[in-house]
Amino acid sequence: MELCVALDLPSAKENLALAESLKAYNVWMKVGFRAYIRDGKPFIEALKAINPDFRIFLDLKLYDIPNTMADAAEEIAKLGVDMFNIHASAGAVAMKTVMERLSSYEKRPLVLAVTALTSFNEENFRMIYEKGIDEKAEQFARMSFENGLDGVVCSTFESRAIKNATSDDFLTLCPGIRPFGEDAGDQQRVATLELANEERVDFPVVGRPIYKDSDPKGKVEEILKLISTF
């Protein structure tokens, strides 16, 4: 299990200050929509300057026609990030096209597919997909696995079933982690680190419980200490 810290603060200055405070730890850093749209490639470079061993997850959730997604995936690969994601809803052709485009890279980033956003509850998910979260997430995961992706973004509650349906090596990255049972905020399907471990999560994503803590570095130390016991 490897910790992924969500850099979701309102400004580059705040996000970089958080990263600076964590530079002693070779954790993953999640860069999302707001940070990347606002701060772009220089922000990625600034993170790597703080700690070259930070691994960067670019959380842009690509969702478009296959060739457009593949074009974007190639540009992402050129940024030197370590992982990015696409929407599984884009379908098998899009997945295959993206992976074929990246096959020429000697060291390509990991590619994950988003199954069901953790902000969904069962009722709202069914209104869109006409199936339950568990069933559809597993279907999306099998499609992703069959088309050569490295893993999926899902909630902790789908992780074990997804690995059983695909492979133990098929990665699960799970937002909505409240390490010690902190407030859920706008997330619907949240879990503690202990549960994430039981459900074989590879990458727990933690944001607010870290950056809203009075001592973010201390919180990360607590989290890493707990992970080391698993």
Curated annotation (Swiss-Prot):
Keywords: Decarboxylase, Lyase, Pyrimidine biosynthesis. Substrate binds at residues 8, 30, 59-68, 118, 178, 187, 207-208. One of its GO terms (molecular function) is orotidine-5'-phosphate decarboxylase activity. SMART domains: OMPdecase. Pathway: Pyrimidine metabolism; UMP biosynthesis via de novo pathway; UMP from orotate: step 2/2. GO terms for biological process: 'de novo' pyrimidine nucleobase biosynthetic process; 'de novo' UMP biosynthetic process. InterPro entries: Aldolase_TIM (IPR013785), OMPdecase (IPR014732), OMPdecase_AS (IPR018089), OMPdecase_bac (IPR047596), OMPdeCOase_dom (IPR001754), RibuloseP-bd_barrel (IPR011060). Pfam families: OMPdecase. PROSITE patterns: OMPDECASE (PS00156). Catalyzes the decarboxylation of orotidine 5'-monophosphate (OMP) to uridine 5'-monophosphate (UMP). Belongs to the OMP decarboxylase family. Type 1 subfamily. HAMAP family: OMPdecase_type1_B. Homodimer. This is Orotidine 5'-phosphate decarboxylase. It comes from Sulfurovum sp. (strain NBC37-1). The lineage of its organism: Bacteria, Pseudomonadati, Campylobacterota, Epsilonproteobacteria, Campylobacterales. The gene is pyrF.
